[in-house]
């Protein structure tokens, strides 16, 4: 994950630690992964009081903890990305991969370390399907097998996915 702003925003924010300096902060809802990761990062950084389930921490609680910054609570990471890229919000937290193709519109202020967010993973597994024929089952296995190859790793890295994770 990363803290982003729009190009030429002249923000005083340098990253998560001073995100409260922003005039507005696009924050994904706590019910979606990027919203949970952001809240967890703020808790782990000592900027926000924790909860057993960080997804229940409200936007108002985040705003108060950050000194009253205006929060635009967004439905998902795509909405956060758009809100910042178009300049509707000064900063936001998004996945690094969501900045791909927007290099001319977004500036990455900080990549948030995993020790604050926890591991950001996209798991994959092949499931059993009694209705799948042999071709469908073997194709699914081939796809999963491909996803763990060096060729797939190169593709993921091209689109800003971090592949330096443990199995």
Regions found by a protein language model. Name each.
Residues 2-167:
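Exported/periplasmic ABC-transporter solute-binding proteins
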């Amino acid at each position: 994950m990363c803290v982003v702003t729009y190009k030429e925003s002249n923000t005083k924010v340098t990253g998560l630690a001073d995100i409260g300096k922003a005039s507005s902060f696009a924050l994904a809802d706590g019910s979606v992964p990027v919203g949970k990761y952001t809240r967890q990062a703020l808790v782990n950084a000592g900027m926000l009081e924790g909860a057993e389930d960080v997804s229940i921490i409200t936007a108002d609680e985040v705003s108060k903890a950050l000194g009253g910054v205006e929060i635009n609570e967004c439905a998902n990471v795509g909405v956060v990305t758009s809100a910042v890229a178009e300049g509707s919000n000064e900063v936001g937290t998004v996945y690094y991969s969501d900045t791909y193709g927007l290099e001319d519109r977004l500036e990455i202020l900080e990549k948030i370390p995993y020790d604050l967010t926890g591991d950001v993973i996209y798991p994959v597994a092949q499931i059993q399907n009694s209705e799948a024929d042999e071709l469908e089952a073997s194709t699914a296995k081939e796809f999963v097998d491909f996803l763990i190859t060096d060729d797939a790793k190169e593709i993921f890295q091209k689109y800003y996915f971090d592949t330096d994770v443990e199995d």
